[in-house]
């Protein structure tokens, strides 16, 4: 991988939040769809800071397992005090409570009511970052939401456990 691509991936995965009062949300996702079956997962690590109240910022952790073969979709969410979270300004390194995502690895668990979803996943091998807007807009205030895919076509392996059912990801 070229030095330029490494620098680009590092910068596009670094956190932008700096405690600003105007409100902020910023999310780091991993998601994958099975190539031939109606199966997928989606995991999100998020900073949410309400407008005018950065002291009320929280980390949010979301996970969804989609099983179209059994028409069973399971979702869970938790909110964690921001003091129990960390988001790197230098690279992909986020922690929401005990859940972490760093370049190439994501691990965590959510229990919400009777639902429990946990994961231990490795990922990599994707293409260069895919910017969905012109590059110059990513450092401006508008638009507020700026999506990008930092590793399109990444491959995953590991496991997800949903309510005691272990699913191998390969």
Regions found by a protein language model. Give the residues of each.
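Targeting-peptide/extracellular-domain and disordered-appendage signature
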Residues: 1-170
């Amino acid at each position: 991988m070229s030095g330029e691509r490494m620098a680009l991936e590092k910068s596009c995965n670094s956190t932008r939040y700096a405690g600003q009062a105007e409100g902020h949300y910023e999310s780091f996702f991993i998601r994958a769809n099975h190539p031939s079956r109606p199966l997928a997962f989606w995991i999100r690590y998020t900073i949410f800071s309400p407008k005018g109240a950065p002291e009320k910022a929280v980390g949010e952790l979301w996970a969804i397992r989609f099983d179209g073969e059994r028409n069973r979709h399971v979702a869970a969410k938790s909110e964690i005090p921001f003091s129990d979270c960390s988001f790197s300004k230098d690279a992909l390194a986020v922690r929401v409570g005990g859940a972490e995502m760093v370049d190439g690895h994501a691990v965590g668990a959510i229990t919400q009511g009777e639902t429990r979803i946990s994961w231990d996943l490795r990922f990599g091998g994707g293409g260069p970052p895919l910017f969905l807007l012109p590059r110059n807009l990513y450092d401006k205030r508008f638009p507020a939401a700026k999506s990008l895919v930092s590793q399109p076509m990444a491959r995953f392996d590991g496991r997800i456990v949903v309510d005691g059912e272990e699913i191998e990801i390969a």
